[in-house]
Amino acid sequence: MVFSVRQCGHVGRTEEVLLTFKIFLVIICLHVVLVTSLEEDTDNSSLSPPPAKLSVVSFAPSSNGTPEVETTSLNDVTLSLLPSNETEKTKITIVKTFNASGVKPQRNICNLSSICNDSAFFRGEIMFQYDKESTVPQNQHITNGTLTGVLSLSELKRSELNKTLQTLSETYFIMCATAEAQSTLNCTFTIKLNNTMNACAVIAALERVKIRPMEHCCCSVRIPCPSSPEELEKLQCDLQDPIVCLADHPRGPPFSSSQSIPVVPRATVLSQVPKATSFAEPPDYSPVTHNVPSPIGEIQPLSPQPSAPIASSPAIDMPPQSETISSPMPQTHVSGTPPPVKASFSSPTVSAPANVNTTSAPPVQTDIVNTSSISDLENQVLQMEKALSLGSLEPNLAGEMINQVSRLLHSPPDMLAPLAQRLLKVVDDIGLQLNFSNTTISLTSPSLALAVIRVNASSFNTTTFVAQDPANLQVSLETQAPENSIGTITLPSSLMNNLPAHDMELASRVQFNFFETPALFQDPSLENLSLISYVISSSVANLTVRNLTRNVTVTLKHINPSQDELTVRCVFWDLGRNGGRGGWSDNGCSVKDRRLNETICTCSHLTSFGVLLDLSRTSVLPAQMMALTFITYIGCGLSSIFLSVTLVTYIAFEKIRRDYPSKILIQLCAALLLLNLVFLLDSWIALYKMQGLCISVAVFLHYFLLVSFTWMGLEAFHMYLALVKVFNTYIRKYILKFCIVGWGVPAVVVTIILTISPDNYGLGSYGKFPNGSPDDFCWINNNAVFYITVVGYFCVIFLLNVSMFIVVLVQLCRIKKKKQLGAQRKTSIQDLRSIAGLTFLLGITWGFAFFAWGPVNVTFMYLFAIFNTLQGFFIFIFYCVAKENVRKQWRRYLCCGKLRLAENSDWSKTATNGLKKQTVNQGVSSSSNSLQSSSNSTNSTTLLVNNDCSVHASGNGNASTERNGVSFSVQNGDVCLHDFTGKQHMFNEKEDSCNGKGRMALRRTSKRGSLHFIEQM
């Protein structure tokens, strides 16, 4: 009550009392609130007696996966003491989140099961009691003697507890308080376990400990929900009833790093319960059985131990269980004194399941994911490789390995990269060696799924592998892809139609793999590219399946919706890239359809002539490949026509085919003609999808390509003999030996390849037309064969031809410099004509293939396609149209009227029509300006005359003339090389030849008894 005594506002004594009372009430309320808050804070941790020294040890996973230890000593802290006695040494702290009114605080409630996905949090306490005067704790078996005497007894206890929790959990947080007076160590810990990890394993490892599942936690609306045990320590969480294992459950003390991990038999998982896993009591001494609505499979632990009964307890809220049969991870021996047995896959003792449709590998946490070094990862991979080397693999052990690989996929990328290829091989080998009785089997884990189906190669049906729900990965084999899948791969029914007979017997199973994370597929060479989908793969009994009559279709959902303006590529993992480390390649893969959330891929190729020497063996854009294809086929068609004309000309007219260069040219034209014809027929024959016919066409294409290369090299070798070995050189059956090399060596190479494996050749798709139809082509399928027998073979020929080309050019320059003043000089056009003709004759233009790389790839592909497909056309121009003696033969026999030449018009002349009569016999005698050469094997000369005509005299006195430096004799066919390849010795001759003075040179030919007069070019 307030009284106003005065108007001036003075307050009476009663008013002062009331004001004081109000202030006192406010202080009491604040005190109550503060005390309540302190009580709730103290309930969140395990506290030791007042005189105790409290040590808080926090383990947080560091960046490299190794727990970092932080120790804080708290002195003179008043804490509530956990009641303890000699008989009961372990208590569970119940963390309360209810206020004084009994109502749960209505703040942001986090459902941990929705956060953890495949894990669960547990809270537990344990109290160790030890004898202060003993160097070894009473209830522990210390096998690592190095710790004794170095650490204090409490530190030793804490160290062993740390190792146990580190081994059994994904992550954990621990806080310990030491009571020296009572010789006790009280520890409270929060651990994160995999949702299929049996919590009794922790109870077995930690003697007399109780574990409580954590479910709901309340936190401030400004704070995100927790994801680690450290964050949970700061919050108020509900604890469910403790998990109780029966009294006769195998117990064991905490163990050191040298001991094996104590694990108990798995509890039965009832998949009928959609969101809960119940711990039921399995029968003693029996394999653990996972009950599913469909046929049941029995799975036996690796080292069978008497199964302890597990009492029922409230269900743990976990993600929905797969309707597949689960198998446990490797379990080591558990007893009161556990022997040092290592958990490995090398010596499994597993019983085969009686009826198995699909098997799901549960993600049991028995190994450390965040290892301290790459050596730990390598040891785990090595254990799996050793187990696979033993042969057949049972489903439960295979499931354990799949789960092990799944956990390793979450290791740091820099540590995982060196082992990526080995892990991929482990996954493939698991599918190859998996032993199962039914038609199909599947193994799933959080990040990896594998499915294997038994097939009959002769009656294979269209099969679709489907992966669904990345949060709870499930796979299935369907006849068609569902709409809600995250990845599918469809194999056509014609998948194995083109397999060889011996491979048909091996193709008894098809394996599918799905990787939820691309950890094993890191390509450092990618620039401005990133993987936006999951990874899916398929293989047929580890065989190389090519020659598909229908494409394989792959549909992959994007992890994040892609932007419309970005370019999406379909790629595959090429194990040969990046020095054998593997890398992404889009060779042969194209986008069939692109949507906002998914991409449909298919594989095919377009074929251009450049694919024969495409060193990178990669494809370009469809529009460019279409243009290259048109250029290729038009060029090959023109070359075939003009090569045929060249062959008919040189074969029909005897006078122009007598010399060696002409005979070699005939062989080269024949090889190029056959190469172009087979290439033109290849794509047409590929449409029939006949394996034997396709292999035959590919073999002939390869053979004629090598023959063409070889005759180009023989052209260069012939020029070398003419320039360097002019004198004292005689080769018996010269052209016959050239033919044996030119046609025989490629035949040997192709025969060796066929002997090794005919499957090195076959049908392949090398691109796609803009309308989506594939362009199939019969060619070399094996990259090693291609690079050795095509690229390597061509490199040798190309280097020889380039060297010879340079030598010829240098020699021509020297000849021109030696000419006397006033002598007739060639024009620049003539020089360019000679160089161009030599370029196409020696196949120098094939060298464009070496520059078809990087940003100039397309440019050189165009140059390659234009010049090499038209090689036959250019040979016709330079060696038929540009040669006057060939033109005269055409005019004589093919023309009529004024264009027709008379029989002997300006072609064949005797030695008296401009030259003094002279006798040519065995040997040649000349004046002091002449050059004579003789040997035991040959005694013939060739006379080169710098004139517009030439006279060739044989032993019988017959002679012939020609222009442009190509000469031949009438009877024996002895010839010289083309004039631009001759090594000439000039001398003056005071005789007229064809109305002019000439300079003459002598050169030896390969036979006896003939003298040739050839004009200077």
From Swiss-Prot:
SMART domains noted in UniProt: GPS
Residues in compartment: Cytoplasmic: 649-667, 715-737, 811-834, 879-1017
Membrane topology (Extracellular): 38-627, 689-693, 759-789, 856-857
One Gene Ontology molecular-function label: G protein-coupled receptor activity
Descriptive protein name: Adhesion G-protein coupled receptor G2
Modified residues annotated as Phosphoserine in this record: 1010
Source organism phylogeny: Eukaryota, Metazoa, Chordata, Craniata, Vertebrata
Membrane topology recorded in Swiss-Prot or TrEMBL: Multi-pass membrane protein
